[in-house]
């Protein structure tokens, strides 16, 4: 069986490689499409590949349950993505390029969903989930930065992306084998636990569907907000107010790491509050830039908040997935919801930033109200219990469900078939340390009769002394 350290390292590496392959492939596809289409066409083409990736994220749950899926799904995911990357490099027709791109991002979406599910399994119950998520995101950003800065564009760039996808496939394949080896034990535990008494906390954790749906809505709303902030930055870049180069993307890696550390404080008790503060900061920066402040403010806040946002929605669904009935579907739902919004609202967000300060203010207030409602619905404004508080709660529930002393004594009497008179003698002897003569007087029978009943009780219960009988009867 794998140690938790190795499982965690493999899942971190897989998520980092997915981030690198996904972002790098998106950047490469946009650049290739830009040689064949005008800017408006590139935006539409990018929307289609992001939509295809969402389909891949959602399809993985069904693919993983097909017969013998453990053997061929990881291979198909990454081999298909590699083949499509090579096709994007070689094709010169826009339609063919679009088809290859959509197919490739469908496969990348499937691989990404599996990488997220592996991460959710490896870090289930871990107090370091957000730090792991932020580290994986930062590593993927750094790999993409190095690929863009130091690797020549074209064939060498594609070779690096294919190498990343191949490494991702290898990790997914071997982690699947390890997961299958442990599955029988997990199923046995699940069947055994199904017969136990259900406590209120168990009922809450089995299927938190309501919270999951609110979380999807929250990601969609926040994606609208950050898309608007991105529109402010993009518009300023296009007008020449600022120059958005490649190096500021390093702030994404740094903010992802910081977000992971901050979110994990006291087992993510304050993650919702921190993200709410980041949201407020983003709204203020949008209004400030629209009102005439330096666009650099929007740029700084955008890169700072984007790392927090990615770490937030990834951690939120990784934490939620193991408690859902179809965890493979929900582990990557944060990325899927973000991608849906990225290709559906980018044009509307950019148009909004060009509509004037009043329109932006109204939209910001509406987004704030919707986001606040979604934060509450997702339960992110309720402080979750710490490990110590959970232990105390579980101990209290166990004490409440444990049989009482009266129930234990009644079960003891029934088990050994004691008569009513023997029961009276047993209760008197076990609850009173006085000599048998005084107990006999209290019961209104002779000492000889008490001794006879006591002898019968010793024989039935296989005890030999009054002390031993008392311990058995009292359950001590």
Segments predicted by a language model, with ranges:
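C-terminal transmembrane helical hairpin of 12-TM major facilitator-type secondary transporters
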Residues: 270-310
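Helix-turn-helix DNA-binding segment
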Residues: 398-455, 460, 471-476
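Intracellular juxtamembrane helix-capping segments at the cytosolic ends
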Residues: 108-123, 308-324
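Helix-loop boundary and gating motifs at the non-cytosolic
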Residues: 2-54, 214-240, 314
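A late C-terminal transmembrane helix in Major Facilitator Superfamily
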Residues: 324-354
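Hydrophobic core of transmembrane alpha-helices in multi-pass small-molecule transporters
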Residues: 95-114, 294-311
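Symmetry-related core transmembrane helices of the 12-TM Major Facilitator Superfamily/SLC fold
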Residues: 156-175, 359-382
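Helix-to-loop junctions at the C-terminal end of transmembrane segments
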Residues: 55-72, 254-270, 353
